[in-house]
Amino acid sequence: MITLAELATNADGKLVQGFVNEIITDSYLLSALTFDDCLNSTGTSDLTYTYKRVKTPMEAKFRALNTEPEKSKPEIERVTTQVAILSDAWNMDRVAKEAASDLYELHLVESKNAIIRKFNATIIGGDTTVDENGFDGLSKAVTGTSTDFTSAVDLDALEKASALAFAEEMDNFLSALMRDPDVLLVSPRMKVKINAICRILGISNVTMDSAGHRVSAWDGIRIEELRDGALKTNDIYAACLGMDGFHGITLKGGNAVSVNLPNWEAPGAVKTGDAEFVCGCALKATKAAGVLRAKPAE
């Protein structure tokens, strides 16, 4: 297993190292996720990851003296998920290279931003029946499970009564998970609502993280805002990060991220550069993640 911070430290080239460091600076989720770096980039025609998801855990019981312990068996689901190649390519004219050398940096920054946006959108709403080249996200994994909740509180006109009712729903929702989650993933609009609820209830908590970002929290749990349309609903996703819970998947050997600059020595006026991130996600236990869906419109 590996984090992107460890991948950056071990990267052979400064270009990849800098690119990955920029990603983890700008994306808490990508910096916090642990990746199972277990897949080979050669010797296979597809990138798939098979694992066991614990749907119902084992149950321990007391036994009487001189009796055998009662047997317990977990309910396990075998899951096969796809690992995807998330990429962005760009063209640059050789004249522009000489006239505007900062275009290199601009293209790399935009590639980094594009990869973060697409990863954030897919980690929630990814569905390989819609995009066969992507990977399945959290929404698909938790739909219809014991951690799939729907709110009954109307948050359009906030007052103390609705704020308290929402807080009770959040307590019920979070208590259904295997432990306190590491992060709540929300849309910008829902983050505004949660911040307003926290102010009404007098539990507002805003700090600064190590990257200099302002961080809001709900009862000590980080609230991460997924911008640029990555999450279009007011649903709240909670995730317990780790290899026993929700984690990423990528290639082994430090090959998760690649960055290629144009070859200006080759013939041709227009050259191509690209950046790629091989990624997927796995939910090892049903209770390692959940969703509190917004109240349906009436």
Predicted features by range, described:
Residues I2-D36, G43-S45, S101-D102, F135-A165, ...:
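Sequence/fold signature of self-assembling virion shell proteins
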Residues I2-A89, D131:
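Assembly/oligomerization interface modules of large self-assembling protein complexes
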Residues F173-L174, E224:
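A generic local secondary-structure boundary/capping motif
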Residues A167-N172:
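Phosphate-interacting basic helix/loop segments used at nucleotide- and nucleic-acid interfaces
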Residues D46-V54, S72-T143, S175-K193, N260-C281:
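Long, contiguous amphipathic alpha-helices that act as assembly "spine/axial" helices in icosahedral shell
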